[in-house]
């Protein structure tokens, strides 16, 4: 038996309130694979044979994979005024520090306000999102150097392909935080192979410095 323990209020929340039909799609996937799940969960204790949740639920286990909350690097956490208590850097729409204008932060290092949930849920930062953030930050840095005014940044989207055994789930949302103009959730083996092809393409262009490619 497989049990999934999550701090999310529902499956497919992903820290962004869900996207389109992600809730239904994830619930269907779990039911089809006979995976039980525990929502709004907080772990109170772990023993070699058992995991106990704060609500008193005890889950027997022979093997467990536990993912602790993310936190920033020590350099940020130990530098007063640079990051928040978790070690992430607060930034504006151009990914410029809200207090120190010569500091920029993108991707996992920057802070995104979380959704309001019963149990805190972190906001994901995918590689695709990080590339978009970096481009916005680079344009803003160039504007700072040349003394020009930065253009309003575009909304960033989120694109994720989640592997699911012999298939995969393609998820897209624009902008990445609600309210969104467009969402798309599709499942199929084509999504798995699309992810494999993209990985080879992405590594090819990065290793050769061809970052101008889409």
Regions found by a protein language model. Name each.
Residues 152-171:
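Flavin (FAD/FMN) cofactor-binding core of flavoprotein oxidoreductases
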